[in-house]
Curated annotation (Swiss-Prot):
Stated consequence of mutating residue 124 to A/R: No longer forms a BioU-DAN conjugate
Organism lineage string: Bacteria, Bacillati, Cyanobacteriota, Cyanophyceae, Synechococcales
Enzyme Commission no: 2.6.1.121
Phenotypic consequence of gene deletion: Loss of biotin biosynthesis.
Protein's name according to its UniProt entry: (S)-8-amino-7-oxononanoate synthase BioU
Reactions this protein catalyses: (8S)-8-amino-7-oxononanoate + L-lysyl-[protein] + CO2 = (S)-2-amino-6-oxohexanoyl-[protein] + (7R,8S)-8-amino-7-(carboxyamino)nonanoate + 2 H(+); (8S)-8-amino-7-oxononanoate + L-lysyl-[protein] + NADPH + H(+) = N(6)-[(2S,3R)-2-amino-8-carboxyoctan-3-yl]-L-lysyl-[protein] + NADP(+) + H2O; N(6)-[(2S,3R)-2-amino-8-carboxyoctan-3-yl]-L-lysyl-[protein] + CO2 + NADP(+) + H2O = (S)-2-amino-6-oxohexanoyl-[protein] + (7R,8S)-8-amino-7-(carboxyamino)nonanoate + NADPH + 3 H(+); (8S)-8-amino-7-oxononanoate + L-lysyl-[protein] + NADH + H(+) = N(6)-[(2S,3R)-2-amino-8-carboxyoctan-3-yl]-L-lysyl-[protein] + NAD(+) + H2O
Quaternary organization: Monomer.
Listed GO biological process terms: amino acid metabolic process; biotin biosynthetic process
Amino acid sequence: MENNSLAPLRVGILGFGGLGQAAARLLAPKQEMKLVAVADRHGYLYDADGIDVDNAVQAYTQQGSVGKAKKGQMSEQSIEDLIGEGEVDGYFLALPNLPNTFMADVTRQFIASGWQGVLVDALKRTSAVEQLITLREDLAQAGITYMTGCGATPGLLTAAAAIASQSFQEIHQVKITFGVGIANWEAYRATIREDIAHMPGYNVDKAQAMTDAEVAALLDQTNGILALEDMEHADDIMLELAGICHRDQVTVGGVVDTRNPKKPLSTHVKITGRTFEGKISSHTFTLGDETSMAANVCGPAFGYLKAGYGLHRQGLKGLFTAADVMPKFVR
């Protein structure tokens, strides 16, 4: 990976559903990053001069793939083909981790390809991050700096918990509660399936196998509300790896409204602990209700990509989490 420090980082996005499209639009006004590559399951698009986001979105929504866009290519091995063609400094893996091994499999593709640079994901499940941990040495040897768990939660709220923990001698509990409002669940099909997988009676395989009609029927039964408790969320292992607390002291739950863009409740993290004076107290960090899921996931992801690029230039390769590194603001 070679990039003049004064030139914008050349960025790719893998996955072009609701999250990937939001990420592309977020990058459009940025000066420090330039979107040059996108891929979906049926095709990819590479343009060293910068991708026309409107054209890419139109091709995806109207023709089913960015491969139909100007300069696009149809491919059933789009990730592999894109890695081989494009000069990209870092990729945001805006991919659904369905099945639960998918992100690790994609990571192995990058390792095997010989590509060097920065990868960032917004993974949710603890078990998915554990799979990446087993690839830590392989990533380092391949010359890849991988930033995992860098969305909203895990990610932004995990980092907030790591900072807030500094006030305490010991941490008693980290409680993350989120509210997500989505006007149209079909724009986030994979994300909703990942959330359904956390519900009682469901798992990743069952949620992945659901048809759109079955998902719609479930949402009809719940009036569009997904109430989630005691989720398997990688905030726990990330804070444990950072030495802040044991994973059993971290709880994550929330409410997703799939029929209303307004958040059903405020997203926040509450950190409770004991100070060195023996006082029990709590810090609470709350996200603004007007900030969308896309803003709170994609913004931190690119902030961590920028931070990861800094690590990469210093020769630091391998796996890092949102609790290990502060994100950098992307101008």
